[in-house]
Amino acid sequence: MVVLVYGCSDQTNLSSKSSESTDWELVILDSIQVDYLGSVGGGDFRNGKGVFFNFQENKLIEFDSTGKIHYERSYPTDGPGKVLYPTQLRYTDDGRLFAASFVGWLYELNRDLTLKQEITLPFPSQANDGGGFFRSLDFWNDSLISYYPGRDGANPYDPYFIRDHFLLEKIDSKTGGSVPLIKIPSTSRYSSDKFFERPWIQFGISGTRLHLALSNEPMIHVFDLNDGGSYLHTVNFKPSKFLDNGEHQEKYQYISGSRMLDGAIRQLFVTEKGTVVYYEEGIDEEIFVQNELNLPKNFPKYKDFQKQVLKIISPDTILSNEIIVPYRIGRIMNIEGLDKPFYALRDDDFVGEEQEYITFYKLLLVKK
């Protein structure tokens, strides 16, 4: 797919294409520059404003759709007012901002990004990784929904964690009280007693439906939040290429990244009119070994041997075409609706340009 470039004035015509088509393309409408020099380690964008996290400074930066910075806030890592690595960021519809660190701390922030409160659960999270642009924090019906493993001492690195435990917590942000939510359905191979590569868990919510994905299975599992998170159905989004290293002979084997690279869901966006899956295809063993892609110095070469793809699943489970995303487009901040523009980080390393600002592409999904 070729990414088309249109001026902003063309947006109305683009959005008015036939509603019957299942073929889509990705259009770059514009770009904005945020006058900040630093890395982006997680973020969100909703209702005309965005926020991103800079790891080196333990800082959040909030900006608007013109690129203007409204607030910058660095946080102490100990003592009063500490906020530790708030990489997961989610705005609510009414403008509240919640954050989670990659090791489980949960926060609510004021509109000027100062700390409003730390949300403390009765038990600690046992997670030691994750965060960033993974989608594992959301808000529904006055409750936070979070991937927060640790209830009853559950270890998320146990090979049967996904099979044996609830995967999410529904959290009262005022009290820290929580109830467990969502069990993996039998449609997932992780419900069995076999061993597989450890996946990342992501989810999103639209209305009363929660959609959950494990990163190395091409499936979306759908649950009803109005019925305590009961399982409804599973959709296989049928990628034409999504490599997988299969069943392991013993636990704690890590094959992906050492001998080959699994296909992986990188981001998941759930909207009223459809779910968008952003995934990478993976790299087979022969290419991986020949090019020594297990070495950190060669990690940037991954982009030479696999594609990154968007695919849309309609509410009635009709699948779109595969929309190839060029690598100059990096992680997506959020997709609020299939008919709304959204923002994605420009990959300056891939483009080969060093700038003293951060560029976000303004994008739109358009039916052909």
Where are these regions (language model features)?
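Beta-strand-rich domains and repeat architectures in extracellular enzymes and scaffolds
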Residues: D30-N58, Y278-E280
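Short, conserved, GDST-rich strand-edge loop motifs in beta-rich repeat architectures
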Residues: Y147-R163, E280-K303, D347-F360
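A short helix->beta-strand "capping" segment at the edge of beta-propeller domains
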Residues: L14-G38, I318
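Asp-box/WD-like beta-propeller blade repeats and closely related beta-sheet repeat scaffolds
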Residues: G104, D112-N141, Y147-Y157
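Surface-exposed loop and turn segments in beta-propeller and other repeat-based domains
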Residues: V27-Q33, R73-K82, I119-D129, S178-E197, ...
